[in-house]
C-alpha cells in the first residue's frame, strides 16, 4: 500500500516503517514497524504471533474506546432504523423494491462517514474494536449450533476448502509471477485470498520474512476485495438461484476476511450468515498449517527463518497461529449440545450475537477507506481481483457439485 491516504478532518495518513502521518494537524507518527490500512494501524513486526490482523486494542486507557464504540452502536442502530424506514416508505409509495437488510445499511452509512467527512482520531480506538465484537458474536453464535451439525458441515466444508485452496492458491501464485510480482508478495496474496484475508497475511509476514511493502500491498488488495464481495456476491447468489444453505457455503469459501464473510452471508439471509460463519471458522482453523507450509518452502530456499525440526516444534507453531475464538465457538456449542443452557439463555446469547455483529458491520464500513485503497499499485489489485474471481468461481462450482450432484450437506 506504500503511502496511505487520509480523509476529512484529521483523517489518518501514514507511511510504513514509522513514517510521519500527513494530517492537517501534522506531526503524528505511526508506530514503528506498522502499516496503515483504512483507519487502522496494523502491526507487521517480524515477531508478530497474534492471530488477529489488526491492532484491536490500541490504548491502555479504557475511556479512549468509548467514543468509537458509541459510534459503532449509533451507526448500527441507524442502519436498523434505515431498514425499517425504507420498508415503510416502499409500502406507502407502493414501490416494488427489494428489502435492503440492516447489514447493508450499517456498512453503507459507515462507508459514507469515512469517505466524506472522515473519521476523527478520537473515534479510532473504539472503532478498531469491531474485530473483537466479531469474535464475540461468533462465540455467542455457537449456542445456535449442535456439535453433530458442526462436525458434519465442518467435515464437508473442509474437503471443499482443501480443493478450493489448492486450485486457487496455485493459480494466484502463477498469475502473480506472470505480472512480475515478487514471490513473497504472490505467496501473501495466495494465503490471504485462499485462507483468511488480513489475519493470514499478518500471520505469514514474520514466518516467511516478507517485506513490509509486500504486506501493505497484500492487505490493501484484500480489503478492496472484501468491499467488492459485499456488493457483488449476494445479487449473484439470487441471480443464480442459490438456496440460503448454498450461498452460506459459497460466502464462507470465497470471501477473505471474517467480518466481510459474516456480513456477506447475513446480507443474503440469517441462515446463510450462520453457515458462512461456520465455514469461515473452518478456514480460519487452517491458518497455522498453511503458514507453516509456506514458511518451510521459503526456509528451504534460505529466505525465511528455519522452523525447528520435530513434531512438537511444528505443533507449537500451528498453535501460535490458531485463531482462539474458534475454540470459544466450539465450547459454547458443546455446552448448548449438552443441554446446559435454558431456552432463555440461548435466546440471550442469540441477542448478544446479533448486537455484536451489528457493531461489526458498522465497523466494516467505518474501516473502509476507498481513497486509500485506490492508491495501491494496480498490479497487486489486478492479481487479487483475478484471485477473487478464481476463488469465487471454483468455490461456486464445488458448492453446486457437492450439493446438487452428490447431495452433501443438503438441508431443507
UniProtKB/Swiss-Prot annotation:
Annotated membrane topology: Multi-pass membrane protein
Spans through the membrane: 67-89, 102-124, 128-147, 154-176, 186-208, 215-237, 275-297, 317-339, 349-368, 381-403
Transmembrane helix listed as a keyword: yes
Region span, Disordered: 14-34
Keywords, in A-Z order: Cell membrane, Membrane, Transmembrane, Transmembrane helix
Secretion signal, residue range per the UniProt entry: none
This protein's GO CC annotations: plasma membrane
Location(s) in or outside the cell: Cell membrane
Principal place of residence: membrane
Family in the record: Belongs to the UPF0324 family.
Designated name of the protein: UPF0324 membrane protein MAP_2119
Source organism of the structure: Mycolicibacterium paratuberculosis (strain ATCC BAA-968 / K-10) (Mycobacterium paratuberculosis)
